[in-house]
């Protein structure tokens, strides 16, 4: 079951064509095969971006602890994902945010993040937190652009120099 459909226009050049694409968002869980395959792509991307920093964080990204997942599709092909997991009674942690390279720059990350925040509110969470790498400027811009504020590194990320953490009241 798809949660929502969002139509976007893609304009690679203002003097050329416009293409309508439909993004579908699906609520699921960490057992979803499309999510699993996107996480494999995410792992490859993170390892390439900074192998040492990624290896430090890897133990904290186990899929078994994730129950709420959004998978984004264009033309029925999975192109992005994100997840939430409970951090404490009032706080949800954003995990496994990823958009395939060929689908970036279209606002898909924002759509996934917005849907995750909505789902977290439906589950009565009040605050959203997350960690990303300092070597991920696109991710940092995504979170800042969606009103996340930088906070001191929390939990397992304390002392990790290459991590940066954010928070947002929902």
Predicted regions and their residues:
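Ser/Thr-centric signal marking residues that sit
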Residues: 81, 110, 132
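Acetyl-CoA-dependent GNAT
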Residues: 22-95, 100-101, 113, 153-156, ...
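Conserved GNAT acetyl-CoA-binding A-motif
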Residues: 113, 120-132
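Conserved N-terminal entry element of GNAT/NAT acetyltransferase domains
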Residues: 1-33
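Conserved catalytic-core motifs of GNAT/GCN5-like acyltransferases
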Residues: 30, 129-134, 140, 144-165
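Conserved acetyl-CoA-binding loop-helix of GNAT-fold acetyltransferases
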Residues: 99, 105-118, 145
């Amino acid at each position: 079951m798809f949660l929502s459909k969002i139509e976007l226009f893609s304009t690679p050049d203002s003097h050329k064509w416009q293409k309508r694409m439909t993004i579908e968002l699906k609520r699921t869980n960490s057992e979803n095969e499309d999510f699993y395959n996107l996480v494999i792509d995410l792992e490859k991307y993170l390892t390439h971006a900074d192998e040492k920093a990624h290896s430090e964080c890897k133990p904290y990204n186990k899929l078994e602890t994730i129950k709420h997942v959004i998978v984004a599709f264009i033309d029925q092909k999975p192109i992005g994902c994100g997840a939430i997991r409970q951090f404490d009674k009032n706080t949800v942690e954003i995990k496994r945010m990823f958009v395939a390279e060929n689908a970036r720059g279209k606002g898909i990350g924002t759509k996934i993040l917005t849907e995750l925040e909505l789902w977290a509110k439906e589950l009565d969470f009040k605050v959203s937190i997350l960690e990303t790498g300092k070597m991920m400027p696109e991710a940092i811009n995504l979170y800042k652009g969606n009103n996340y504020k930088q906070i001191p590194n929390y939990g397992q990320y304390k002392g990790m120099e290459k991590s940066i953490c954010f928070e947002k009241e929902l």
